[in-house]
Amino acid sequence: MIMSLSILYILPEILLALGVIVVMFSGLFLHGKIRNINYIFFQVFTLLALIATFAKEYLIQTTGLVFEGQVVFSGFAYTLQLVILVLAVFVALYSRDYVKDRKISDGDFYTLLMLCVLGAMVLTAAHSLVTIYVGLELLSLPMYALIAIYRDSGKGLEAAIKYFVLGAIASALLLFGMSFVYGMTGKLDITEIANVLAHGNFAGLQQQFLLVYLVMMIATFLFKLGAFPFHMWLPDVYQGAPNAVANIVATIPKVAAFAMLVNILFVGFPSLKDSWIYLFRIIGILSIFFGSLVALSQTNVKRLLGYSTVSQIGFVLLATTLNPQGYALTAASFYVIVYLFTTLAVFGVLTTISVGGYEVQDLNDLKGFNTKDSWLAFILLIVLFSMAGIPPFGGFIAKLFVVMGLINDGNYFLACFVLFMAVIASFYYVRVIKTMYFDDPDNDETVKPPLTSLIALSINGLVLLFLGIMPMLLLGVLTQVTNVI
């Protein structure tokens, strides 16, 4: 494919890279001269990238590779890239007043955020071991800086160091696994690796070593997702990071990590599916069990959300093990998207109300929240209902598809286990609702969220309701784009 045409396939990434440069220089030379200029530049370039990605998805109806197999263009990649960009727009919107209130450099904040978005976009479309590693580092490095960006918070620095150390170990595991896979196959392209494994003579000890190398690679992305037992960093980072940054950590990297798991497992290593499918079931079960039980004892809201994430990711991993493959990928993708928008809304509410000295950390901070802002409390109620899997919200449909898939596969015991743990998990969501609606507030501080955040949060809540009432619209798109993987 000619170079000029190939560049069109990465136009969104080019726009984001240009946006990084513009926001960085804007932060240096225009800071304080034009109100919200860095925020405006961020949203403009992100929306341009969103439009370019949307146009690509509907103008390009084929799947293929560009740049010598380094980048894949497919409906699946474009759909997840659209999700990343929508998340970025909402995260920035929720964060605008929070960043100003905490006197965080908005130039630094939006530059680092856009770098994270760019890294996630690259990682989602990566089709080569080299591109995967570059995308991962482009996503991770600015994330470490973002977690520690609020200089007045010692917990933020501690969380950043912990995340950096564990992230470095995860990256090293990925490199080790990649180098061994390259040594055995002589290929960097994921599709070519799959072809070598399918037609090569890999048996006995060689196949066992290959499985070990695969585990080393996917451990990195399980770490980014926060699955058990790679979750150690997650509650601490959620708690220590500023609320606006916690929203970023909880959403954008999850999309890219999920995309890479799908590409590596279903495109690169389908020949080892009989082995990794059992591994994912075990990790999924342990994630649901551990995350749900530990969350019950949490009094810090963000730590509770951290352990809740571990449990939710367990459902995603179980979904990837279902049959047939098209159903598995559709169910897992739908669950991920619903999870992302519920998490976006929860942290969006926490970020929006954590302005003017009112910082939400513990459950006690939400006592009587309904009396302070009944509309925000209602939105949070909707989101928590969705997380708990209560109809008619998107979370119910997402969990239902996983349970139905397990039943169709004959895994009745596992389906009963998932249902039981979903009931257990609902207790800690209900506890938050009870605190908001039935406990008396500890203080008389008022909450005055900006109108733009209220509108965005309302849209966020409507999306979750829409996904519960009319899920087939999104499921139809996901079925179409996952069938060609």
Swiss-Prot record:
The chain crosses the membrane at residues 10-30, 40-60, 71-91, 107-127, 129-149, 164-184, 209-229, 248-268, 276-296, 304-324, 336-356, 377-397, 410-430, 454-474. GO terms for molecular function: NADH dehydrogenase (ubiquinone) activity; NADH:ubiquinone reductase (non-electrogenic) activity; quinone binding. Keywords: Cell inner membrane, Cell membrane, Membrane, NAD, Quinone, Translocase, Transmembrane, Transmembrane helix, Transport, Ubiquinone. Belongs to the complex I subunit 2 family. It is an enzyme of class 7 (translocase). The gene is nuoN. NDH-1 shuttles electrons from NADH, via FMN and iron-sulfur (Fe-S) centers, to quinones in the respiratory chain. The immediate electron acceptor for the enzyme in this species is believed to be ubiquinone. Couples the redox reaction to proton translocation (for every two electrons transferred, four hydrogen ions are translocated across the cytoplasmic membrane), and thus conserves the redox energy in a proton gradient. This is NADH-quinone oxidoreductase subunit N. Its main location: membrane. InterPro entries: NADH-Q_OxRdtase_suN/2 (IPR010096), ND/Mrp_TM (IPR001750). It is found in: Cell inner membrane. One of its GO terms (cellular component) is plasma membrane. Its EC number is 7.1.1.-. It is a multi-pass membrane protein. It comes from Francisella tularensis subsp. holarctica (strain FTNF002-00 / FTA). GO terms for biological process: ATP synthesis coupled electron transport. It catalyses: a quinone + NADH + 5 H(+)(in) = a quinol + NAD(+) + 4 H(+)(out).
